[in-house]
């Protein structure tokens, strides 16, 4: 934010790190950068910002629905270490502008490699091409829809399943941490499974409730649910999918 303020000629207000940053100030702002958690804990205060960018963690479907009701311009960001800052934005709010498509900013251009992964040309910050492991659906040279990580794809009966997309659909049904993974299947090759950090007793009818939903394809629907007391996490509190799945062995 310091660099952004210097480039754009903005005045900064310095606040202590907090999950509820608006609680430490009574001011209104032109531009604010938040994590999804900070946004969720500040829903009643987001109207104090004209524009908000969100990054650093996934945005669940229920969270996105709540954010669409805020009278503020809110954008999801796409970027990585190699691009220094975000290179694309996706509008979340107001509701009439909501889209699942990211649009590049500046001189950035995008295309796909042979595996369907995003390749970025961002001359302002990097020389040459930046190859990612993010599988996307292109909408021209300056727009794309993010589908998931190449490393996580599940091949079930020849159908490619993107766990991140399934997780987005599941986020309305599960209040604890969870993720989609795979296990070998004699008929399908790989089948979708669901891992939940919590107690089975708290979700007595979860599988049968999911089977009644029409938002899942027959291959996306988890074939089995596993409950674990604790997931393996990184130092930044992100789920280590493969390490956690190994706990089932």
Label for each model-derived stretch:
Residues 31-33, 53, 195:
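Structural motif
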Residues 75-82, 101-103, 181-184:
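Beta-strand->loop->alpha-helix junctions that form or flank phosphate-binding loops
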Residues 30-31, 50, 134:
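Conserved acidic residues
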Residues 193-197, 212-249:
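Conserved C-terminal "lid"/linker of ANL adenylate-forming enzymes
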Residues 46-95:
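Gly/Ser/Thr-rich phosphate-binding loop
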Residues 109-137, 142:
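AMP-binding/adenylate-forming core of the ANL superfamily
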């Amino acid at each position: 934010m310091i660099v952004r303020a210097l480039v754009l000629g903005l005045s900064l207000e310095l606040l202590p790190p907090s999950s509820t940053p608006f609680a430490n100030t009574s001011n209104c702002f032109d531009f604010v950068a938040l994590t999804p958690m900070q946004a969720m804990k500040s829903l009643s205060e987001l109207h104090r910002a004209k524009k908000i960018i969100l990054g650093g963690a996934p945005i669940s479907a229920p969270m996105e629905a709540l954010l669409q009701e805020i009278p503020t311009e809110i954008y999801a960001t796409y970027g990585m270490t190699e691009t220094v800052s975000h290179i694309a934005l996706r509008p979340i709010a107001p509701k009439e502008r909501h889209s699942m498509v990211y649009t590049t900013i500046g001189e950035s251009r995008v295309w796909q490699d042979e595996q369907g992964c995003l390749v970025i040309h961002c001359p302002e910050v990097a020389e040459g091409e930046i190859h990612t492991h993010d599988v996307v659906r292109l909408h021209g040279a300056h727009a794309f829809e993010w589908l998931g990580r190449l490393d996580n794809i599940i091949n079930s009966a020849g159908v490619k399943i993107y766990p991140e997309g399934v997780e987005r659909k599941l986020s309305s049904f599960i209040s604890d941490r969870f993720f989609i993974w795979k296990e070998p299947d004699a008929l399908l090759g790989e089948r979708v499974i669901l891992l939940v950090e919590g107690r089975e007793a708290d979700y007595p009818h979860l599988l049968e409730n999911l089977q009644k939903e029409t938002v899942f394809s027959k291959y996306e629907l988890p074939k089995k649910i596993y409950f674990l007391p604790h997931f393996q996490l990184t130092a930044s509190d992100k789920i280590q999918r493969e390490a956690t799945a190994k706990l089932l062995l």
